[in-house]
Design a protein with these regions (language model features):
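A structural signal for short loop-to-beta-strand junctions that line the ligand-binding cleft
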Residues: 74-75, 82-83, 114-147, 180-181, ...
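Extracytoplasmic/periplasmic substrate-binding proteins
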Residues: 33, 92, 193, 230-313
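Extracytoplasmic/periplasmic substrate-recognition and gating elements
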Residues: 24, 48, 52-53, 78, ...
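Hinge/lid segment of periplasmic solute-binding proteins
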Residues: 88-142, 167, 194, 281, ...
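Conserved N-terminal structural module of periplasmic/extracytoplasmic solute-binding proteins
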Residues: 21-99, 111-112, 159, 244, ...
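Glycine-centered hinge/linker elements that transmit conformational signals in sensory
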Residues: 170-172, 213-244
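C-terminal capping/gating helix-and-loop segments adjacent to ligand/active sites or protein-protein/ligand interfaces
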Residues: 339-344, 356-413
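Extracytoplasmic/periplasmic solute-binding protein
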Residues: 132-137, 167-217, 260
Length: 413
């Protein structure tokens, strides 16, 4: 089943009409969803670099990734596009390319030797029909565990290595009763993010690629998948009653403030620790949990550029594409965002202990796992998200969930 962009995205009339731009003025309206403290500090790096290059950055931040995507895509389809829009690394811009709505960045990619300095999976995720249509700006690990070191020390716990270790510590924190064991954001996308971390860590790499990449319905009916489902549902025992609807960064702040012990979240969470003045390996720790055959779920962010008729807009787009990937910008952005540079040829000595761990994961090809957005189209991701949310929020059994996921995968063939 394929839901086309033009059917699934409502074309909403908008009052965001761009002001006329003179031929010698370089102006860029950028739609993104970076609105938390750490995210805002990171995107300012791009804005400042663009301003230094003589441009005017028009910040069109929209809270929530889905909201920002829908706003940007709707405007592009309606003929009133922004200069640049943020998307996740993966398949989210497929139909924009198919519709002839995006400009490729192949010339800039060749000029900057992107293929020589980025992981092959990232290049592939940005390439359509032999040309690059997206600027990958970072690599985010999606399945990190973050923990407050003082809180874990208070119950005599060391850094967990496996999901079994983590659950044992969560049991200790729950029995101690002083903090919330697991900080959680009860929103659909973060329910799915937690499930994904369990699936890769408990189910392993073959299950990850089998479910998301191959859409193998028989695998969803397996005992191994049901074990993943049971582990996932067990985690609900460790979250608080205030979790439903909570923002992810508010959950991160619970760990920062010592009100919660742990959080499963991508390394964008580290930007919140940084903004709060916390130091990796001193105030907080980080690890990726695996019961033996997991991996590092590697995603990130890209910017794409709608086709423009105005030469000054094209100039702004090319300038953005270049400056986002200069070594200086890459490091400055990573230090604020919590991600790691997408380029392998930058000096990473200034990165903290958690980022250094991330660099080691990415350097190990056996650990590199493409994100769900790289493996599956948005329709599949959305259908799985609905199933996961229903399982988390109801009394649905693991067997029922297994059957539901199998049906979703079958319908997406």
């Amino acid at each position: 089943m394929k839901r086309t962009l033009f059917a699934s995205i409502a074309i909403v009339a908008t009052a965001w009409a761009s002001a006329p731009v003179s031929a010698d003025e370089m102006k860029a309206e950028v739609i993104h969803w970076w609105t938390s403290g750490g995210e805002a500090a990171a995107v300012k790096v791009f804005a400042d670099q663009f301003t230094k290059a003589g441009g005017t950055w028009v910040d069109s931040a929209v809270a929530g990734a889905a909201n920002a995507r829908n706003a940007a895509i709707s405007r592009t389809v309606a003929g009133n596009p922004p200069t640049a829009m943020q998307l996740n690394t993966g398949k989210q811009f497929d139909e924009l390319v198919e519709g002839g709505l995006l400009a490729d960045v192949d010339t800039i990619a060749t000029e900057g030797n992107w293929k020589g300095v980025m992981p092959a999976a990232i290049i592939a995720a940005a390439t359509r029909n032999g040309k690059m249509y997206a600027v990958p700006i970072n690599i985010h690990g999606q399945n990190w565990l973050w923990y407050n070191k003082a809180v874990l020390a208070s119950v005599g716990a060391d850094e967990p290595k496996t999901w079994n270790d983590a659950i044992a510590i969560l049991d200790k924190l729950k029995a101690d009763g002083k903090v919330i064991p697991l900080a959680f954001s009860g929103q659909k996308n973060w329910e799915q993010n937690l499930f994904n971390a369990v699936m890769i860590g408990v189910g392993g790499a073959q299950m990850w690629t089998g479910i998301l990449g191959k859409r193998d319905a028989s695998l969803a009916r397996s005992a191994e998948f049901k074990a993943v489902a049971v582990t996932y549902k067990k985690l609900k025992d460790y979250v608080d009653a205030g979790a439903p609807g909570r923002n992810w960064n508010d959950a991160t702040n619970m760990v920062i403030q010592g009100k919660a012990g742990m959080q499963i979240m991508g390394d964008w969470a580290k930007g919140e620790f940084i903004a709060a003045g916390k130091v990796a390996d001193k105030d907080y720790g980080c690890t990726v949990l695996s019961n033996g055959s997991g991996g590092y779920v590697m995603g990130g962010d890209v910017f794409v550029f709608p086709k423009a008729k105005d030469p000054s807009t094209t100039k702004a787009q090319l300038t953005l594409a270049r400056l986002m990937l200069t070594p200086e910008t890459q490091i400055q952005f990573a230090l604020k965002k919590g991600s790691i540079p997408v380029r392998s040829d930058v000096d990473t000595s200034a990165l903290d202990a958690c980022a250094q761990k991330g660099m080691r994961y990415v350097a190990d090809k056996a650990q590199q796992m493409p994100s769900g957005d790289m493996l599956a189209p948005p329709a599949t991701i959305g259908a799985l998200q609905d199933a996961i949310s229903q399982y988390w929020n109801t009394n649905m059994s693991a067997d029922e969930f297994s059957a539901k996921v199998a049906a979703v995968l079958k319908s997406q063939e």
